[in-house]
Amino acid sequence: MNEEYSLQDLLGQESELQFAFFNNQTAWKLGCQLKKIAEDNSTLVAIEVYAFSQTLFSYAMSGTQLDNQIWIKRKRQTVLRFGHSSYYIGQYNKAKNREFEQQVHINADDYCAHGGAFPIRIKKCGLVGVVTVSGLPQREDHQMVIDALTDLIKSVQKS
């Protein structure tokens, strides 16, 4: 898991990992999928699935802290504002040799460019929400979300 994704890879994930439909039940399944991945790997994370202007799934594993919820909020806000995964935003700014949180138009209390938040998109519709994980190094938070989305989208397409 040490290999970095290229910006092109990250944009490809965003293009590929879109739902044909998404509702409250889908949000619940996505949250449960993330919880299962975390438990199977004995990782301590906080999870949020936010869509349609509300939190549809939230879970904090025993051992997580309030800080994880604060990170979730900041990551989510970044995706909602910029329309890309929080990991992409961080890598994009890194490629530009700048710190995202130090830019004049960014309030670091509200936004952060650390991996773990990913846009929830409905094909031919657009951004409807954000799925976020906090508790691991940013690359691993991002990968956990990618794994859960990949599994869920495949299972939904089969049914």
UniProtKB/Swiss-Prot annotation:
Disulfide bonds: none annotated. InterPro entries: PduO/GlcC-like (IPR005624), PduO/GlcC-like_sf (IPR038084), YBR137W-like (IPR010371). NCBIfam families: PRK02487.1-5 (NF002696). PANTHER family: PTHR28255, UPF0303 PROTEIN YBR137W (PTHR28255:SF1). Belongs to the UPF0303 family. This is UPF0303 protein Ping_1243. It comes from Psychromonas ingrahamii (strain DSM 17664 / CCUG 51855 / 37).
